[in-house]
Amino acid sequence: MVDDTANRPSWDEYFLGLMDEVGNRATCDRGRSGCIVVRDKQIVCTGYVGSPPGFPHCDEAGHLMKGVIEEDGTSRMHCVRTIHAEQNAICQAARHGISLKGSTLYCKMEPCRVCAMLIISVGITKVIAKKKYHAAQETREMFKHAGIELVVVEDVVEQYERQ
């Protein structure tokens, strides 16, 4: 009998790999990312960066950039044509009447503030992010306050175009 457990990924590695694959469906090249929500080692829902149904995607119509001014006074450009992978996954669960209470969310980078509020609101209890997000300090504080466990696998900030 052959022992293949040495080459077998952990559950977290498995779900992070699938999350990357889901991200291949993303339609904004600034942040092609995916999201998987899991409960009891079963996938509950997935999401990727994309426009709402019936609206043009960045890949088709180009980016819809808006300026954002950070608290420190620096300005950044943000594409607002699409919704984030985490938002899309939560919307998919809502459309199908699926509770996310007590589940784990896998994502490419730490969630933004808006995604963090949604994650808290739907009862997700753990977030596993592949990398750090450049503006995640408030998310970290919110998760700590809400009792959500945040695990960042790689101690590296995700880099993307026009960050």
Question: What role is predicted for each listed range?
Answer:
Residues 1-163:
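Zinc-dependent deaminase catalytic domain
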